[in-house]
């Protein structure tokens, strides 16, 4: 047992020495070398090592000629390692440090993808009634990121994909609202049904889910003896009869995200 402890101690000591020497190695390398090694790891898909070296560039050489590109690469590398919180922290730092950069559209796009990834669990749980009142700040933040990108950089290479993702988010949130309206309808919560569908008409007027929610609103008004409102809703349904909506699929994970 004593020998085993001895060998364990030696192994742990060796590991500690190796770890320290590795850390020292990064600390002592010149900027150009750190940056180049980080870029090599990035190109090879070794994102954790890329972050290690690029973080050293950023912390040891602030304000250098590599600073902006290093921050862009760190945003990408942290996104790829699914450290979404850090990705958003770095994106916010980029907006503050480089408010006039020609890469703002890229950072907005990456922020949108990151917030969308954080909101994925929300979208997957859209029809869980026990979560009916839950708000998702992440998925709405993603929509805002993409919307800002499209409005401010309409000619950006990321604009078309951002539009597609906005459409998907909008359709998903509308389906969620429809599920909630159906939930209330089954419980004869007529006021809640009407209010929910009115909100859908305001926020998601051009979606399949909103059109499908209109009969629920008409029925709710009828049961509350609000006949004028029920008739107006029926007229809207009739005016949109036969209208078709394109099926919106979730956009695939984009390729070529590394900003050179």
UniProtKB/Swiss-Prot annotation:
Main localisation: membrane
InterPro entries attached to this UniProt entry: BamD, BamD-like, TPR-like_helical_dom_sf, TPR_rpt
PROSITE patterns in the record: PROKAR_LIPOPROTEIN, TPR
Record CDD domains: BamD
Covalent lipid adducts (N-palmitoyl cysteine), residues: 20
Signal peptide bounds: 1-19
UniProt record, GO biological process: Gram-negative-bacterium-type cell outer membrane assembly; protein insertion into membrane
Covalently lipidated residues, kind S-diacylglycerol cysteine: 20
Residue ranges of the TM segments: none
Membrane topology: Lipid-anchor
Keywords recorded for this protein, A-Z: Cell outer membrane, Lipoprotein, Membrane, Palmitate, Signal
Cellular component GO terms, alphabetical: Bam protein complex
Cell location: Cell outer membrane
Gene3D superfamilies: Tetratricopeptide repeat domain
Record flagged with keyword Signal: yes
Keyword Lipoprotein attached: yes
HAMAP family hit by this protein: OM_assembly_BamD
Subunit structure: Part of the Bam complex.
NCBIfam families: OM_YfiO (TIGR03302)
Function comment: Part of the outer membrane protein assembly complex, which is involved in assembly and insertion of beta-barrel proteins into the outer membrane.
Family designation: Belongs to the BamD family.
Name of the protein described by the UniProt record: Outer membrane protein assembly factor BamD
Source organism of this protein record: Pasteurella multocida (strain Pm70)
């Amino acid at each position: 047992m004593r020998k085993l402890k001895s060998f364990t101690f030696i192994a742990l000591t060796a590991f500690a020495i190796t770890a320290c020497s590795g850390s020292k190695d990064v600390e002592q390398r010149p900027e150009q070398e750190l940056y180049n090694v980080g870029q090599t790891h990035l190109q090879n898909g070794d994102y954790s090592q890329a972050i290690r070296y690029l973080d050293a560039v950023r912390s040891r050489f602030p304000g250098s000629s590599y600073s902006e590109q290093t921050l862009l690469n760190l945003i990408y590398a942290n996104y790829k390692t699914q450290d979404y919180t850090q990705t958003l922290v770095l994106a916010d730092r980029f907006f503050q440090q480089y408010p006039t950069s020609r890469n703002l559209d890229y950072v907005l796009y990456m922020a949108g993808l990151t917030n969308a990834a954080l909101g994925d669990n929300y979208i997957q749980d859209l029809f869980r009634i026990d979560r009916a009142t839950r708000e998702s700040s992440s998925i709405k933040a993603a929509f805002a990121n993409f919307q800002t990108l499209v409005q401010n950089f309409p000619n950006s290479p990321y604009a078309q994909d951002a539009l597609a993702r906005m459409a998907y988010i909008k359709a998903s949130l509308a389906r969620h609202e429809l599920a909630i309206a159906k939930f209330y309808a089954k419980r004869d919560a007529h006021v809640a049904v009407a209010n929910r569908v009115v909100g859908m008409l305001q926020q998601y007027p051009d979606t399949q889910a909103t059109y499908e929610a209109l009969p629920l609103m008409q029925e709710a008004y009828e049961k509350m003896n609000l006949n004028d409102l029920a008739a107006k809703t029926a007229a809207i349904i009739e005016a949109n009869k036969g209208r078709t909506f394109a099926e919106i699929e979730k956009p695939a994970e984009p390729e070529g995200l590394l900003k050179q």
